[in-house]
């Protein structure tokens, strides 16, 4: 997995497989509150970040796309990384991580908080 840095100095998850229009998702689940966030990128490989969807699961009882950024609180999360490897398969790996200010999973140096673009 690669972490890219945008022009606004925010770091975001990024990985693309070889298929022309892959589906990529990062899911974070807080181990204590069970609050869940997902970040989806359905852009073509050649044009990343042109088709993004941000969802805070359960925000209004259903999955709701967000136009603003999502702040992810410092805490203990299960981080699921999904990558579409073929037209029919969506693989995932699970990593367990404590998220602290300053780590480079998703980081905004403006407010020292977890932020999805």
Predicted segment positions?
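Short, aromatic- and glycine-rich surface loops/edge beta-strands on solvent-exposed regions
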Residues: 24-28, 72-87
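Contiguous beta-strand segments within globular domains
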Residues: 1-21
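Short beta-strand elements
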Residues: 85-117
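Signal that preferentially marks extracellular ectodomain short beta-strand elements
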Residues: 52-72
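A structural detector for beta-sheet-dominated domains
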Residues: 14-16, 29, 55, 82
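Solvent-exposed serine/threonine-rich low-complexity stretches and specific carbohydrate-binding patches
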Residues: 35-53
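Beta-strand-rich interaction surfaces with strong enrichment in secreted/lumenal proteins
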Residues: 1, 40, 67-68
